[in-house]
A protein has these predicted regions:
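Helix-turn-helix
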Residues: 28, 32-70, 74
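DNA major-groove recognition helix of helix-turn-helix
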Residues: 65, 76, 158, 165
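Alpha-helical DNA-contacting segments of helix-turn-helix folds
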Residues: 37, 72-79, 129-133
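C-terminal peripheral helix-coil segments that are non-catalytic and often amphipathic
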Residues: 1-13, 146, 174-217
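Amphipathic alpha-helical interaction segments
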Residues: 28, 70, 100, 156-163, ...
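Hydrophobic alpha-helical connector segments
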Residues: 85-121, 125-126, 132-135
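Amphipathic alpha-helical packing segments from all-alpha helical-bundle domains
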Residues: 123-160
Length: 217
């Protein structure tokens, strides 16, 4: 209408959280990536998602890590240092030493889903992870040979136990992911959610004992 003064309402502008110049570090990036992975999964982790969580531009992240693969390598190294993965302990009873090591490794991975995703599911090892793995393998095989096994039998036995441990962890992780999806869907539909099912140790122990008992001496 004539004489009316139209006042256009201004939309409130979204306030972006910006970090102070120079405050972004690789440590902050890696820790944020861990938080994202713990809430979702390694598969969903991306550089843009990390940048968004930190309130910075994607380009700022690339000043510290060149790509997603390098970020995952940095996470893997940090996860390994934090995990307390048990070292192989030599003894005169190689079966007990290998059994204790297998149980310890399995227990560590089962308690840390992000570590499992980074090392076992991702399939690409950082130089540190590869080096640590090779050291433990050589130590275990050397102990088995010292106890009377020939080199080929020692290698085959260690490989069999490693595959058993790896398979048990991966199966438990897949079940965990499947149950998480089911709980989410059930919650969205307003239904009841069941408690997570703990991994079955009995099958693992039976197979581990059988593998070790089949080896002479």
């Amino acid at each position: 209408m004539r004489g009316e003064v139209r006042v256009q309402a201004r939309k409130p502008q979204r306030q972006s959280v910006r970090r102070a110049r120079g405050s972004l570090t690789e440590d902050a990036i890696v820790e944020t990536a861990f938080a994202i992975a713990a809430e979702s999964s390694i598969e969903e982790l991306s550089i843009p998602l990390v940048a968004k969580s930190l309130g910075v531009g994607v380009t700022s992240i690339y000043w510290h890590v060149r790509n997603r693969s390098e970020l995952l390598d940095a996470m893997t190294d940090r996860a390994l240092r934090r995990s307390g993965l048990p070292a192989f302990t030599e003894s005169d009873d190689w079966r007990e030493s290998l059994k204790a090591h297998a149980r310890g490794v399995r227990r560590t991975f089962l308690s840390d889903p992000v570590l499992t995703d980074l090392i076992l599911i991702r399939g690409a090892l950082s130089p540190l992870a590869r080096r640590l793995g090779e050291q433990e393998t050589q130590k275990a095989i050397a102990n088995m040979i010292d106890c009377g096994l020939d080199e080929q039998t020692a290698h085959d036995t260690y490989s069999a136990v490693s595959e058993l441990v790896r398979g048990s962890i991966l199966l438990a992780r897949l079940v965990q992911k499947h149950n998480a999806v089911q709980r989410t869907e059930s919650a969205d539909e307003g239904g009841f959610t069941s408690a997570p099912v703990p991994p079955d140790d009995r099958a693992f122990e039976l197979l581990l004992t059988s593998v070790l008992a089949s080896v002479a001496p």
